[in-house]
UniProtKB/Swiss-Prot annotation:
Protein's name according to its UniProt entry: Peroxisome proliferator-activated receptor delta
Similarity remark: Belongs to the nuclear hormone receptor family. NR1 subfamily.
Modification after translation: 'Lys-48'-linked polyubiquitinated; leading to proteasomal degradation. Deubiquitinated and stabilized by OTUD3.
Gene: ppard
SUPFAM superfamilies xref list: Glucocorticoid receptor-like (DNA-binding domain), Nuclear receptor ligand-binding domain
Keyword Protein transport attached: no
NR LBD domain location: 166-394
Length: 396
């Protein structure tokens, strides 16, 4: 019988363990591509998990990147900036899909691979019909899990919805919103000028916790997720939920503010900027990301597959069986690539651009986690929700 994460306890019950195979070369050898710590010998060279996954996706998905003549220097801090030069460096240093991928595998599995003939492709392409079915399943699960879809959010933001949200732009309107206009009143919260930033921080946490629980339900509906080790399910959610949250948050934003409480309220960007430090810095980076992400003009079916691929990411630290996760993710990425090709015929580079956005989301989450930890240290009244505290623990 398969193990499952308890419905209302996502992520919390276990701490990811570190694979025993992560010991041989990764402690002292740098990635030949970007200089990060290598996790093993992948595709013919010592490489980190990030560069291994990048090379694997590029080969398997037959990606083509926009040409670059600058011969960009590839380092850990900028390795996601130029995919063309990064792939060229992989090739120039000897990475090959024909090379045996040792990585973090048990010795018995490595011996089997050495003895087996090496094929041109590490896995057969999924039949087109299977990819279409996968797309439909994930899209259906997404729409059944999340009530605030991008279409609904855009209808509200553009005035196509008959009901306008209550606009929160100062202390008075926030107070009205807290009296039941937008949110259910919180009996323990007392809004004063000195506590306004803390209160907004608390509201952000409430929304995050609700979304984490919804993402957990969505993840359990993704084909293949339930077959993973429980440890790996927990690890994937721990590292993936905030990337998914900020991806979906972009749908609720425009340049002037964001929708809250299922579209019942709209908090202005200027009001969020007016909060005292450090709370004024919480949302601004998300607006910057949203402006670029929304320019890609994704719809809900695109987002469903993209969010699923974020969750099923095989290079998360502490996975027991990363190759199993990678196999599931590659099926999802194959479905996403096919779907984008069919629905965005005028955007041939949309798929690699989305892969780049995965890296942008990681950086956004890293910066957010650092800010949250700083608030936790410096603001005695700004308590962190236990679920979020568990997610952030030992993460960055």
């Amino acid at each position: 019988m398969k193990e499952e994460i308890p419905p209302r306890s996502p992520i919390l019950d276990e701490q990811p363990s570190t694979p025993l195979e992560h010991q041989e070369t990764s402690q002292s050898v740098d990635c030949k591509i970007c200089g990060d710590r290598a996790s093993g010998f992948h595709y013919g060279v010592h490489a980190c998990e990030g560069c291994k996954g990048f090379f694997r996706r590029t080969i398997r998905m037959r990606l083509q990147y926009e040409h670059c003549d600058r011969n960009c220097k590839i380092q850990k801090k900028n390795r996601n900036k130029c995919q063309y030069c990064r792939f060229n460096k992989c090739l120039s240093l000897g990475m090959s899909h024909n090379a045996i991928r040792f990585g973090r595998m048990p010795e018995s599995e490595k011996r089997k691979l050495v003895q087996a003939p090496v094929s041109d492709s590490a896995a057969p392409d999924s039949p087109v019909s299977d990819l279409d079915v996968l797309s439909q399943l994930i899209h259906s699960s997404y729409m059944n899990t999340f009530t605030m879809t991008k279409k609904r959010a855009r209808d509200i933001l553009t005035g196509r919805n008959s009901i306008s949200p209550f606009v929160i732009h100062d202390m008075d309107t926030l107070w009205q919103a807290e009296q039941g206009t937008v949110w259910e009143q919180l009996p323990t919260q007392n809004l004063t000028g000195t506590e306004i930033g803390v209160h907004v921080f608390y509201r952000c946490q409430c929304t995050s916790v609700e979304t984490v629980r919804a993402l957990t339900d969505f993840a359990k509906r993704i084909p293949g997720f339930g077959t993973l080790y429980l440890n790996d399910q927990v690890t994937l959610l721990k590292y993936g939920v905030h990337e998914a949250i900020f991806c979906m948050l972009a749908s609720l934003m425009n340049k002037d503010g964001l929708l809250v409480a299922g579209g019942r309220g709209f908090v202005t960007r200027e009001f969020l900027r007016s909060l005292r430090q450090p709370f004024c810095h919480i949302m601004e980076p998300k607006f910057h990301f949203a402006s670029k992400f929304n320019a890609l003009e994704l719809n809900d079916s695109d987002l469903a597959l993209f969010v699923a691929s974020i969750i099923l990411c095989g290079d998360r630290p502490g996975l027991i069986n990363p190759s199993q996760v990678e196999d599931i993710q590659e099926g999802i990425l194959g479905a996403l690539r096919r779907h984008l090709k069919a629905s965005h015929t005028d955007a041939p580079f949309l798929f690699p651009k989305l892969l780049h956005k995965m890296a942008d989301l990681r950086q956004l989450v890293t910066e957010h986690a650092e800010l949250v930890q700083s608030i936790k240290r410096t603001e005695s009244s700004a308590a962190l929700h236990p679920l979020l505290q568990e997610i952030y623990r030992d993460m960055y």
